[in-house]
Regions:
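The feature marks either
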Residues: 125, 132-137, 141-179, 186, ...
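Short low-complexity stretches enriched in small and charged residues
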Residues: 25, 93-98, 106-109, 148-156, ...
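Short, highly charged low-complexity linear segments
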Residues: 43-49, 76-80, 158-162, 256-260, ...
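Solvent-exposed soluble domains appended to multi-pass membrane proteins
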Residues: 166-420, 424
């Protein structure tokens, strides 16, 4: 019985591995659920492959399966018949303990992120990242995310879609300040600060609650405040791809979780890197959460700083390092930066549930967390003004998404997705 099991597993692993090796040369990404779409027409699937190559691939699959099976086949033949253990309770307890211990490596550790394809990404050369991926895991991961999206969208003929979309593009007079040339400098340094769950309902200048974020209010008065700015989704992973890549969010899926797709997206950081910018991403949490690492490497980030770069004593919240510590780290990275121009992106986290922050200024936990991060923003900007890079640095503050506040707000209410984007140079 063991030998039958080993034979089946060996053949499946060999077929996936060899199939992946062949398909990668055509597709440029590791094997996923895509080949299964062609099972209904296998002749068409292999039409572009020469007959001799097809025969060679099948032969190599059997050879590789035999190599995998041979040691297990020999080992299984040497095991004796099963005997009931003398101490059944002790044996069961040991078996249960060993099975439970497997949960940690299967999950991928103790952090908020689970095992995902993006965890093995380590290089700015995508081919090396692909080489580190286990093809069997890649396929199984893809199958777990497979979903039929056809019923979630309405499709139109291109002509009708153009008619519907054209009015959304505006076309009226520009609302950009007439003296905008004073904001434009040649190859400025760029700081993109993404504020976790910040919402227009907490900003007075957007018609929200007064007194929550006085520092961002001040920055908005000194720079440019985009008041007609709305979040693309309600999740960070989808908001980030919208901010960096201009990719619209889908109802039940996140493109960040599909590295084979996200690697082909455009990106602000990718374009700036090609233009000679030094790029860096900072996040006080787990950079492997929702395949973030693979996405930011694909977007041209030269360096990623995350929770593992901070001592355990500073990881004080469920999500990681609080914002006052990470803002201080962000300031240090800018101060120590020797190469210009540079683009640095920073994702905050303290204003995420459960809103545990080292400050108690407001009674409401969400608003208090916003006020706390706002105070960190104020301290950071004041210190940054004293650095030489201040005069040639563009700072953009934007929320990844808003927050359901108050709790009874309806899903169709625009306040649910209204976010602000103050810009200062």
């Amino acid at each position: 019985m063991y030998r039958v099991y080993f034979a089946i597993v060996s053949f499946v692993v060999a077929a996936i591995t060899l199939g992946d090796a062949v398909l990668y040369s055509y597709w440029g990404f590791r094997i996923d659920a895509t080949p299964l779409f062609y099972l209904t027409s296998p002749a068409d699937a292999v039409a572009s492959i020469p007959a001799w190559e097809t025969v060679l691939i099948v032969f190599l699959i059997f050879v590789y399966a035999a190599l995998l099976l041979w040691p297990m086949w020999r080992l299984s033949g040497k095991t004796g018949s099963w005997q009931r253990p003398k101490k059944s309770i002790l044996s069961f307890a040991c078996l249960l303990l060993l099975a439970a211990s497997l949960f940690i490596p299967i999950r991928g550790g103790f952090t908020v992120s689970t095992m995902n394809v993006g965890k093995v990404y380590f290089s700015d050369r995508m081919a090396l990242n692909h080489a580190a991926i286990n093809p069997v895991f890649s396929l199984m991961s893809s199958l777990s995310k497979s979903e039929d999206f056809s019923s979630q969208y309405r499709f139109f003929e291109p002509e009708k879609a153009d008619v519907i979309f054209e009015p959304l593009r505006g076309g009226g007079p520009s609302v950009y300040p007439a003296d905008s040339l004073q904001w434009v400098k040649a190859r400025p340094n760029v700081l993109l600060i993404v504020l976790e769950s910040f919402s227009g309902v907490a900003m007075e200048s957007l018609g929200g609650i007064p007194g929550v974020m006085p520092n961002l209010e001040k920055i908005a008065s000194e720079g440019i405040l985009f008041t007609n700015f709305y979040a693309n989704s309600f999740r960070t992973d989808r908001g980030l791809t919208s901010i960096l890549s201009g990719y619209p969010a889908q109802p039940t899926a996140s493109i960040m979780k599909y590295p084979a797709k996200s690697q082909s997206l455009p990106g602000i950081s990718k374009s700036l890197r090609k233009a000679g910018y030094d790029t860096q991403f900072l996040y006080g949490g787990d950079a492997d959460f929702t395949n973030m690492r693979s996405y930011f490497i694909s977007m041209g980030m030269d360096n990623i700083v995350c929770d593992r770069d901070f001592p355990l004593s500073q990881r004080l919240s469920k999500w990681g390092v609080p914002d006052d510590v990470t803002f201080e780290k962000f300031y240090s990275l800018i101060k120590e930066q020797s190469r210009e121009p540079f683009m640095k992106m920073f994702l905050t986290l303290s204003s995420h549930e459960p809103f545990d922050v080292p400050m108690n200024r407001l009674e409401d936990k969400y608003l208090n967390s916003i006020a706390y991060t706002d105070s960190c923003v104020g301290d950071f900007v004041e210190k940054l003004k004293r650095l030489p890079v201040w005069d040639n640095t563009l700072i953009v503050f934007v929320a990844d998404h808003a927050k359901r506040y108050p709790q009874n707000v309806e899903n169709h209410d625009l306040s649910l997705i209204h976010i602000s984007e103050p810009t200062r140079q």
